[in-house]
C-alpha cells in the first residue's frame, strides 16, 4: 500500500519515493511508489503532475486502491528517486477546490441546496440542485470572500466512527469507513479526498463569473486565487483597450458601448431603408426584352437579393436572378414560376459550381462563375 503523503501535508513539494513497479502501457510507463505526494484524479479534481527522477508524470490515477503514476520514461524497480510536484499547478487546484468548498457550504447553509456536480480542470464548475438569482450569488460571493479575509484554518482529518456519527457534513456518497473530512470552521464540513490550502487566506479571491440554469438547478462558473487574478488582468486589458478606442473613462465603457451599438443599429436601419429604395427604383425602371434576366448589384445580402429578384419577377414575370459579389464568387436569388424555375435551376447547377436550393418559386445560394458566363446562360 502506497503511503499518501498528500494526506498529511498538502504543501509538500518534494519527496523521495522508491519504485515498487514499472510497466509499459502504450506510449507511457505505469509506476507505483512506496510513498507519494502526487494526488490522483478524484472528487472532481484533476491529478497532480511533476517528475519522478527525470521521468515526467503527466497523470496520476487510483485503481483498486493502487496509486498509478503515468511516466514518459521507464524507472528502475527498487530504486529510490527524488520526486518533485508541479506545485504551482497543485496550489492553483487547491485554491479553486477550497473556494468551491466555501461556496458550497454557504449555499447549503443559506438555501439548503446540495452540490450535485463539481469539475475542476482548465475551468471550474459546480452544480446545485436549486436555482439561484444574480442577487443571491452576489451575496454568496461576498460571504465567500469574507471567509477568505478571515484567514480561517482548513483542517483535513479522519474522524473516528463515533466522531463521524456526531458530524453534520456534506457528502455526495453514503460513506461508511475511512471518511476524510475537510473542515472550514463555521463555513463548511465536507467529505473530501483532495489536498486543500492550509488557511482560507491562501485562496486570495473567489469570483463567480457566470451562471446558467442546469437540470432544474444552477451551474456556476467560478475562478479562485491565481485563476481569478489572471482573469481580472485579461479583462482589465480589454476594458483599457476599449476605453482608449472609444475615448471613454473606464467606468463609462459599458455605457459608451451601448451608445455605439445604438448608433450602429440606426445606421444599419438607414442603410437597409436605402437598399429597399434602390430595389424599388430598380424594379420600377425594369423593362426586360427577354423572359430571363440576371441583374448584378454590389453590397446586397441574401435577403435583399431575394427582395430584388422577387420585385423584378412581379414587375415583368419570367425568371429573374439577382446577384451580388466579386471576383467570380456571388450570392444569388432567382425567382420565377416554379415549374419553369425548376428546369432552369437544374441547368444552372449543371453549368456552374453552385451551392444552394429552395422551393415555391425561389432558389438561393452561392455560385462561382464569371458575370459573362452567368448572363450567357440567362440569354439562352
Annotate the PLM regions:
Residues 1-380:
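A glycine- and charged-residue-rich anion-binding loop/surface
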Amino acid at each position: 500500500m502506497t503511503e499518501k503523503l498528500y494526506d498529511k501535508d498538502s504543501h509538500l513539494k518534494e519527496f523521495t519515493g522508491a519504485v515498487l513497479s514499472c510497466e509499459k502501457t502504450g506510449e507511457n510507463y505505469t509506476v507505483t511508489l512506496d510513498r507519494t505526494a502526487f494526488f490522483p484524479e478524484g472528487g472532481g479534481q484533476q491529478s497532480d503532475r511533476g517528475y519522478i527522477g527525470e521521468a515526467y508524470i503527466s497523470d496520476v490515477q487510483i485503481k483498486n486502491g493502487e496509486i498509478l503514476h503515468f511516466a514518459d520514461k521507464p524507472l528502475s524497480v527498487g530504486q529510490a528517486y527524488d520526486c518533485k510536484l508541479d506545485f504551482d499547478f497543485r496550489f492553483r487546484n487547491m485554491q479553486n477546490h477550497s473556494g468551491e468548498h466555501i461556496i458550497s457550504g454557504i449555499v447549503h447553509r443559506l438555501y439548503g441546496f446540495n452540490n450535485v456536480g463539481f469539475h475542476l480542470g482548465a475551468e471550474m464548475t459546480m452544480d446545485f440542485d436549486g436555482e439561484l438569482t444574480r442577487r443571491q450569488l452576489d451575496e454568496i460571493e461576498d460571504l465567500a470572500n469574507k471567509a477568505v479575509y478571515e484567514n480561517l484554518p482548513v483542517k483535513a482529518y479522519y474522524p473516528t466512527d463515533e466522531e463521524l456519527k456526531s458530524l453534520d457534513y456534506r457528502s455526495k456518497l453514503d460513506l461508511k469507513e475511512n471518511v476524510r473530512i475537510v473542515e472550514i470552521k463555521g463555513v463548511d464540513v465536507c467529505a473530501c479526498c483532495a489536498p486543500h490550502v492550509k488557511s482560507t487566506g491562501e485562496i486570495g479571491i473567489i469570483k463567480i463569473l457566470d451562471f446558467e440554469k442546469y437540470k432544474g438547478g444552477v451551474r456556476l462558473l467560478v475562478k479562485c486565487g491565481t485563476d481569478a487574478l489572471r482573469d481580472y488582468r485579461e479583462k482589465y486589458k480589454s476594458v483599457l483597450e476599449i476605453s482608449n478606442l472609444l475615448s471613454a473613462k473606464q467606468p463609462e465603457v459599458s455605457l459608451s458601448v451601448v451608445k455605439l451599438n445604438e448608433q450602429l443599429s440606426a445606421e444599419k436601419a438607414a442603410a437597409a431603408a436605402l437598399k429597399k429604395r434602390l430595389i424599388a427604383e430598380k424594379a420600377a425602371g425594369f423593362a426586360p426584352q427577354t423572359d430571363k434576366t440576371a441583374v448584378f448589384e454590389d453590397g446586397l445580402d441574401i435577403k435583399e437579393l431575394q427582395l430584388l429578384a422577387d420585385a423584378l419577377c412581379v414587375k415583368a414575370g419570367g425568371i429573374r436572378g439577382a446577384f451580388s459579389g466579386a471576383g467570380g464568387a456571388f450570392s444569388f436569388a432567382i425567382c420565377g414560376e416554379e415549374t419553369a424555375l425548376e428546369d432552369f435551376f437544374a441547368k444552372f447547377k449543371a453549368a456552374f459550381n453552385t451551392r444552394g436550393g429552395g422551393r415555391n418559386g425561389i432558389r438561393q445560394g452561392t455560385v462561382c462563375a464569371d458575370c459573362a458566363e452567368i448572363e450567357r446562360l440567362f440569354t439562352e
